Curated annotation (Swiss-Prot):
PANTHER family: 102 KBASES UNSTABLE REGION: FROM 1 TO 119443, QUORUM-QUENCHING LACTONASE YTNP-RELATED-RELATED
UniProt family annotation: Belongs to the metallo-beta-lactamase superfamily.
Organism in which the protein naturally occurs: Azorhizobium caulinodans (strain ATCC 43989 / DSM 5975 / JCM 20966 / LMG 6465 / NBRC 14845 / NCIMB 13405 / ORS 571)
InterPro entries: AHLLactAttM, MBL_superfamily_lactonases, Metallo-B-lactamas, RibonucZ/Hydroxyglut_hydro
Protein known as: N-acyl homoserine lactonase AttM
Length: 263
C-alpha cells in the first residue's frame, strides 16, 4: 500500500467521571471516552500515531496499569490492540517506519516496541519527564510501555524542532503543544484529496476545551494548556484544517473509521 491515507482507529474506551475530562464539571457523573489512534500510509513507509492502549490491558488491566484503574477503567478487546488492527488492514508491521508519540501517557503507548523496523519519535522533555514524573502525574505513565531496550528513538526539542516535517513532504508535521503533558505534541496532516486535518490529541480532549469552555481534568500546566489551544486554533484557522479532538465521545463518531480512510 503506497497511497497516502489517514486511518482513524480506536483501541476501546476508558470509563471515568466527567470531572476527569472536564475540570470541576459533572457532579460525579459517569463518563466514557474513546481511545483513538491513527495510521498514515505513505510510499516512504507507514506511521502509527500513538497506538492507543497497550493490548495487555484487554486481558489484565489492573496487572498492567495498577491503581490508575480506579480512575480510568479500560474497556478493550484483544483484537482492538494496535498491531491486530494494523494487520487487519492488510499492512505488514515490518512496513511501519515511524511510531510517533504525542506524549507517553498510558492510553497512547500501545504501539511502542511492537513494530520491528520503526523509529520512535517523541519530544525529549516528554521522554525524560516520563521516567521521573511529578507526584500528581506518576499514575499516567506506565514505564514498562516505553522503557524497552533496543528501540530506536528520535528526540525532538520543543520550540527548536517545532513544525517538524516527518516525511519532508508536508504530509505529517508535529506541532509542539505542551500543557496536558510537558512534552505534548499535536499533528497537522495534509492529504491530497481530503486536505488538512489537525489532530489535537490531548491538547484538547473535547470541543469544550477547544472552544475554551472547560479545562481538561488532568494537566501539567494550566497556562501552557490554554496557550497551546490558542496556538492550535490559530493554526486551524490559517490552514483551514478539520479539527480532530483527542477523546471526545460526541465528536469522534462523526469521523470515518477504518477500514474507511481519508486520502
Amino acid at each position: 500500500m503506497t497511497d497516502i491515507r489517514l486511518y482513524m482507529l480506536q483501541s476501546g474506551s476508558l470509563k471515568c467521571k466527567v470531572h476527569n475530562i472536564k475540570m470541576n464539571q459533572g457532579n460525579g457523573a459517569d463518563y466514557e471516552i474513546p481511545v483513538p489512534f491513527f495510521l498514515i500510509t505513505h510510499p516512504k513507509g507507514h506511521t502509527i500515531i500513538d497506538g492507543g492502549n497497550a493490548v495487555e490491558v484487554a486481558t489484565d488491566p489492573r496487572g498492567h496499569w495498577g491503581g490508575v484503574c480506579d480512575v480510568y477503567w479500560p474497556v478493550m478487546r484483544e483484537d482492538e490492540g494496535c498491531v491486530a488492527q494494523v494487520k487487519a488492514l492488510g499492512i505488514d508491521p515490518a512496513d511501519v517506519k515511524y511510531v510517533v508519540q504525542s506524549h507517553l501517557h498510558l492510553d497512547h503507548t500501545g504501539a511502542i516496541g511492537r513494530f520491528p523496523n520503526a523509529t520512535h519519535i517523541v519530544q525529549r522533555r516528554e521522554y525524560e519527564y516520563a521516567f521521573t514524573p511529578d507526584w500528581f502525574a506518576g499514575g499516567g505513565y506506565i514505564r514498562k510501555d516505553f522503557d524497552r531496550p533496543g528501540l530506536r528513538w528520535q528526540f525532538l526539542n520543543a520550540d527548536v524542532d517545532d513544525y517538524y516535517d516527518i516525511y519532508g513532504d508536508g504530509t505529517l508535521t508535529t506541532v509542539f503543544s505542551p500543557g496536558h503533558a510537558p512534552g505534548h505534541q499535536s499533528f497537522l496532516v495534509r492529504l491530497p484529496k481530503s486536505g488538512p486535518l489537525l489532530l489535537t490529541i490531548d491538547a484538547a480532549y473535547t470541543l469544550d476545551h477547544w472552544n475554551e469552555q472547560a479545562l481538561p481534568g488532568f494537566l501539567a500546566s494550566t497556562v501552557d494548556t490554554v496557550r497551546s489551544v490558542q496556538k492550535l486554533r490559530t493554526l486551524a484557522e490559517r490552514t483551514g484544517a478539520q479539527v480532530v479532538t483527542g477523546h471526545d465521545p460526541d465528536a469522534w463518531p462523526s469521523f470515518k473509521k477504518a477500514p474507511g480512510y481519508y486520502d
